[in-house]
């Protein structure tokens, strides 16, 4: 169960930044909470790195995730404590330089599902990344080795330090079946969200064949009744929706 939410101020007070540690903000332009606008107002000199820069998605500004470094007394931190939004981004501490952090985040632009399908990884959305990191346990540091501890939607998570390996080309991370099954048992929203995004990017014709709310219900129904151990999980979803269109 989630613990009582903690504010950035209290989180940093409990474990202050040590020499060589940096506070990073991952923030999304896609959130309806206007987090990016608030950041520009409170930190007008912030240097934001577009995480999809240098990829085929570098022009997707309306949904772009960004990386920036903050001071421990940043004027943006109170907004984080006060907002009710859960999809705007998160904070993390690292000993790596901004460019190295940027490259590791960019290497997670897409990941592989257990059936081999490549999907966008919503790492900037705390609703998705927190249960994944928590579910990975000690292996969480293998996915984002540049970060030592996180504050995601008021929940603190520590993964410890490790040697930061060389950045790999995406999609390099294969989402473990066991992790997805655990997420499904606890809350299927992460898997449903990933499948919705996969449909929008890879099969827009199917995606726009239904009102979004209806499509989400159909995807949820499929996800709940189809074992993730199926080798062709995404193919079965596509076939199921194609049949629904015909009907």
PLM region descriptions:
Residues 1-122, 126-247:
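Terminal low-complexity "docking" segments
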């Amino acid at each position: 169960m989630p613990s009582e939410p903690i504010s950035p101020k209290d989180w940093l007070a409990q474990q202050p930044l040590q020499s060589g540690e940096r506070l990073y903000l991952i923030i999304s332009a896609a959130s309806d909470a206007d987090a990016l606008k608030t950041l520009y107002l409170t930190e007008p000199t912030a240097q934001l790195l577009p995480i999809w820069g240098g990829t085929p998605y570098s022009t997707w500004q309306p949904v772009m995730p960004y990386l920036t470094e903050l001071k421990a007394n940043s004027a943006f931190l109170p907004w984080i404590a006060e907002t009710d939004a859960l999809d705007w981004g998160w904070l993390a501490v690292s000993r790596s330089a901004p460019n190295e952090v940027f490259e590791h985040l960019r290497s997670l632009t897409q990941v592989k599902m257990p059936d081999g399908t490549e999907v966008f990884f919503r790492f900037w959305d705390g609703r998705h990344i927190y249960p994944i990191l928590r579910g990975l346990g000690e292996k969480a540091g293998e996915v984002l080795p540049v970060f030592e501890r996180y504050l995601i939607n008021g929940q603190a998570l520590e993964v410890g330090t490790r040697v930061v390996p060389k950045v790999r080309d995406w999609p390099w991370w294969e989402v473990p079946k066991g992790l997805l099954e655990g997420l499904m048992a606890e809350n299927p929203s992460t898997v449903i969200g990933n499948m919705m995004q996969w449909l929008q990017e890879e099969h827009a014709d199917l995606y726009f064949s239904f009102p979004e709310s209806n499509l989400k219900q159909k995807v949820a129904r499929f996800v709940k009744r189809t074992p993730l151990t199926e080798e062709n999980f995404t193919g079965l979803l596509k076939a199921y929706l194609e049949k629904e269109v015909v009907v």
